[in-house]
């Protein structure tokens, strides 16, 4: 019996040390050395103060800001601890009601509804925390944001273009706009204006 237990205990201790201590320590040091921003949460600072993360969406509802994808997290929007989608199917009447309410909110904010509304402005993402929207969703909001900030639509469109990231490595994903970075660029441009 002793001959069976001893190797098991040794294996348990060795694997615990390797997988529970050594591997996490090596990965932490590697991450901090090679990818320090990402290892610390891709935090965005303004005037020495953390204002958000490039990886987690935030709620913007003032007309002078670009709005991101809607959050389905509970009990409050953009709650990272409650990440998850609404799980409403495409034929669920509740989803249709939510989309209609979101279109009405866009209309009430002064958005021109003569153009088709990009789907990412009226539906929540799978995680409920998406920090990015499509360039089409950003372009759809240019007129409203320009009017609210007393800027020309061309100036706002240039900021959208400057804050649009292409496909990763030229092939992965789709072009996207980080809403927090764009809104911070808008604030900076208006302060300089």
UniProtKB/Swiss-Prot annotation:
Keyword presence, Electron transport: no
Pfam families documented for this protein: KdpC
Positions of transmembrane segments: 7-27
Membrane topology value: Single-pass membrane protein
InterPro entries xref list: KdpC (IPR003820)
Role, per record: Part of the high-affinity ATP-driven potassium transport (or Kdp) system, which catalyzes the hydrolysis of ATP coupled with the electrogenic transport of potassium into the cytoplasm. This subunit acts as a catalytic chaperone that increases the ATP-binding affinity of the ATP-hydrolyzing subunit KdpB by the formation of a transient KdpB/KdpC/ATP ternary complex.
Assembly and binders: The system is composed of three essential subunits: KdpA, KdpB and KdpC.
Entry's family note: Belongs to the KdpC family.
Protein name: Potassium-transporting ATPase KdpC subunit
